Structures are given as C-alpha cells and as structure tokens.
Amino acid sequence: MKNILIVDDVKGWRDFCSNVMFEIFGSDINVETADCAKAAYDLLLQAHPYDVIITDLQMEDDFSPKYAGEWLVEQIKSFNRYNNTNIIMISASYNIRHIAEVLEVKCIPKSTALKCLSAYKEALGVN
C-alpha cells in the first residue's frame, strides 16, 4: 500500500489530487491531506513514512521570504526516511520550475495539472 500526503490550502485542489492518485494507483493507497505546511510537518513527524508527497508552493505566509511549500520541501529532505519519497510541487506561480529545480523535486504547473493526468504519471515515473 502506498502512503500519500497531499498539501494545499485549497480543499478543491486536495480533493482533485486525491482523486488523481486513486486513478493512478487504484484503491490500494492511503491518502492523507493537510491544509498548510505546518500541519503537513506535524504529520511528517508522527505518521508513517510517505511514498509520495504532493505540495502546493504558495500557502500560508508565515515563512517569508520563502514560500510555505519551499520550506516544507526543505524539511522533508532533512529526514532520512524520506530520501526515496517522490515529491511533487504544484503551483500557479511563474517560477515553480526554477524553485523545483533548486530543491531537486518534480513540479507540475497547476494549469497543466488540471488538464493532464500524464503529467502526474510522468512525475511519479508511472506508465
């Protein structure tokens, strides 16, 4: 069973990404969601390790000058147990590709995310 964490401040996006994960992996997954980076961080500390983490880039403003998603990815990467976790950053931000490249994670612009299931499959390495 795959454990998946979806982090976004917009419930509609959390629901959409959850549905996409069920479509890709079937029903043998456990999906948890968080509405902000801080809540996601708390889950990282107490939950079982996640195989896939999908996070929005822009959420709460508490991490200025960084984006909340940027801060969260840095925290995830500081845990050894997440070394093999697929991390996907989603955002409508114009600079998502640059930030994802610096953080060494996959990214999907939200404009593509709505239209293209294959973008998720490609980011996850799934056929």
Protein language model features and the residues they cover:
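Output/docking surface of receiver
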Residues: 6-12, 33-35, 90-96, 101-127
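Two-component/phosphorelay signaling modules centered on CheY-like receiver
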Residues: 11-32
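Short amphipathic alpha-helix used as the core "switch/output" element in two-component signaling
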Residues: 64-83
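Extreme N-terminal starter segment of soluble prokaryotic enzymes
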Residues: 1-4
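His-Asp phosphorelay/catalytic-motif detector in bacterial-type signaling
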Residues: 49-51, 80-86
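Active-site residues of response regulator receiver
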Residues: 56-62
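Short, well-ordered coil/turn elements that cap or connect secondary structure elements
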Residues: 26-28, 82-84, 102
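Acidic, metal-coordinating helix/loop segments flanking the phosphotransfer/catalytic sites
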Residues: 18-19, 33-52, 56
